[in-house]
Amino acid sequence: MGDARDNEAYEEELLDYEEEDEKVPDSGNKVNGEAVKKGYVGIHSSGFRDFLLKPELLRAIVDSGFEHPSEVQHECIPQAILGMDVICQAKSGMGKTAVFVLSTLQQIEPSPGQVSALVLCHTRELAYQICNEFVRFSTYLPDTKVSVFYGGVNIKIHKDLLKNECPHIVVGTPGRVLALAREKDLSLKNVRHFILDECDKMLESLDMRRDVQEIFKMTPHDKQVMMFSATLSKEIRPVCKKFMQDPMEIYVDDEAKLTLHGLVQHYIKLSEMEKNRKLNDLLDALDFNQVVIFVKSVSRAAELNKLLVECNFPSICIHSGMSQEERLTRYKSFKEGHKRILVATDLVGRGIDIERVNIVINYDMPDSADTYLHRVGRAGRFGTKGLAITFVASASDSEVLNQVQERFEVDIKELPEQIDTSTYMPS
């Protein structure tokens, strides 16, 4: 099987796109007149039923515990299910994935042996997660099959899957999808829905953009194209639109302000030598469901995790130095709640949804305001409360913190001696 859940026959990990330096120019506030810009609205009076979705989808939505669409779902789904091209920027945790999952499942008419929808994303973890969302929402659509394809898995497994039980929806990373398409194992001639998640990450990397373009040219001219991301600079938006025909543009709470709903943000000034002791104190003092601790390198992730385990903290780490099989096993272990602390590099900084995470600690300062946005967006997702704490240990750290505050017009205060649990812990 090519599905990530089968965890078999993994090869050595291939080149990782996700650890590339991220250089995203500042976004301006102004977008063209077609764009939709609104502030955060927690609960809309209208429900998912108002979108006239299939009963099978509504049933799966109820099973998942969703009662009301988020703002981005409210803005996007009615147009997306009509087949319109969509480009959407909305901050982390606002339910962008469900927009294209539900819209695709609503429209798809599965035909045996034909791939109708293609979803591309830049990391294997994100591909695995998106595939699971399709599986979750297609519970009552048994004829619709979805599979995930990415590097690090023996390509023969993927070829056999496509030959024996071709899925209707393919989720994957550009490199592996292109390899399968070039060798004629994966036919894209019937694709009706072409989706890029975290599109800026793929289109800013020239290598990945070339792969995406080549894949795009293998699909029919007449298809729906949807692109989503938490960060879309003014410079990358025209690149996105080259793939589209008169897209509907939705910029929910455009990036001028970082107002992640319910997220409390603080910093701590300290020396490099004081970080371990302070982290230990925080983990003892704070109430948390699960916490993600971000560091700047593979070696620091491994060392810090070892230290935490020695101090009897329920910690696990994920970084790009591991085999894909090991990374996936650890990700599943954390997501399922077997461990409460995750030490990670920026590999986990984009797109990974774990609902129980309510605290993010930047043990090492991120390298840019964009990276900060993606990291702290791991806490307080789905409109729940959360806390982000950033260690500031140098002049360059202070500079990045100032950039974050200026760019997102947010006032990040020093962590007080006492912090009210109710401000960051879901009730």
Curated annotation (Swiss-Prot):
<keyword id="KW-0694">RNA-binding</keyword>
<dbReference type="GO" id="GO:0008380">
    <property type="term" value="P:RNA splicing"/>
</dbReference>
<keyword id="KW-0813">Transport</keyword>
<dbReference type="GO" id="GO:0051028">
    <property type="term" value="P:mRNA transport"/>
</dbReference>
<feature type="region of interest" description="Disordered">
    <location>
        <begin position="1"/>
        <end position="30"/>
    </location>
</feature>
<keyword id="KW-0507">mRNA processing</keyword>
<dbReference type="GO" id="GO:0005524">
    <property type="term" value="F:ATP binding"/>
</dbReference>
<dbReference type="GO" id="GO:0003690">
    <property type="term" value="F:double-stranded DNA binding"/>
</dbReference>
<keyword id="KW-0509">mRNA transport</keyword>
<keyword id="KW-0067">ATP-binding</keyword>
<dbReference type="GO" id="GO:0003725">
    <property type="term" value="F:double-stranded RNA binding"/>
</dbReference>
<keyword id="KW-0539">Nucleus</keyword>
<dbReference type="InterPro" id="IPR011545">
    <property type="entry name" value="DEAD/DEAH_box_helicase_dom"/>
</dbReference>
<comment type="similarity">
    <text>Belongs to the DEAD box helicase family. DECD subfamily.</text>
</comment>
<dbReference type="GO" id="GO:0003727">
    <property type="term" value="F:single-stranded RNA binding"/>
</dbReference>
<dbReference type="GO" id="GO:0016887">
    <property type="term" value="F:ATP hydrolysis activity"/>
</dbReference>
<dbReference type="GO" id="GO:0003729">
    <property type="term" value="F:mRNA binding"/>
</dbReference>
<feature type="binding site">
    <location>
        <begin position="90"/>
        <end position="97"/>
    </location>
    <ligand>
        <name>ATP</name>
    </ligand>
</feature>
<feature type="domain" description="Helicase ATP-binding">
    <location>
        <begin position="77"/>
        <end position="250"/>
    </location>
</feature>
<dbReference type="GO" id="GO:0005634">
    <property type="term" value="C:nucleus"/>
</dbReference>
<dbReference type="Pfam" id="PF00270">
    <property type="entry name" value="DEAD"/>
</dbReference>
<dbReference type="GO" id="GO:0006397">
    <property type="term" value="P:mRNA processing"/>
</dbReference>
<keyword id="KW-0547">Nucleotide-binding</keyword>
<dbReference type="GO" id="GO:0003724">
    <property type="term" value="F:RNA helicase activity"/>
</dbReference>
<dbReference type="GO" id="GO:0005730">
    <property type="term" value="C:nucleolus"/>
</dbReference>
<protein>
    <recommendedName>
        <fullName>DEAD-box ATP-dependent RNA helicase 15</fullName>
        <ecNumber>3.6.4.13</ecNumber>
    </recommendedName>
</protein>
<keyword id="KW-0347">Helicase</keyword>
<feature type="short sequence motif" description="DEAD box">
    <location>
        <begin position="197"/>
        <end position="200"/>
    </location>
</feature>
<comment type="subunit">
    <text>Interacts with ALY2 and MOS11.</text>
</comment>
<dbReference type="GO" id="GO:0005829">
    <property type="term" value="C:cytosol"/>
</dbReference>
<dbReference type="InterPro" id="IPR027417">
    <property type="entry name" value="P-loop_NTPase"/>
</dbReference>
<dbReference type="InterPro" id="IPR014014">
    <property type="entry name" value="RNA_helicase_DEAD_Q_motif"/>
</dbReference>
<keyword id="KW-0508">mRNA splicing</keyword>
<dbReference type="InterPro" id="IPR001650">
    <property type="entry name" value="Helicase_C-like"/>
</dbReference>
<feature type="short sequence motif" description="Q motif">
    <location>
        <begin position="46"/>
        <end position="74"/>
    </location>
</feature>
<feature type="domain" description="Helicase C-terminal">
    <location>
        <begin position="278"/>
        <end position="423"/>
    </location>
</feature>
<dbReference type="GO" id="GO:0009506">
    <property type="term" value="C:plasmodesma"/>
</dbReference>
<keyword id="KW-0378">Hydrolase</keyword>
<dbReference type="InterPro" id="IPR014001">
    <property type="entry name" value="Helicase_ATP-bd"/>
</dbReference>
<dbReference type="Pfam" id="PF00271">
    <property type="entry name" value="Helicase_C"/>
</dbReference>
<comment type="function">
    <text>ATP-dependent RNA helicase involved in pre-mRNA splicing. Required for the export of mRNA out of the nucleus. In addition to ssRNA and dsRNA, binds dsDNA, but not ssDNA.</text>
</comment>
<dbReference type="GO" id="GO:0046686">
    <property type="term" value="P:response to cadmium ion"/>
</dbReference>
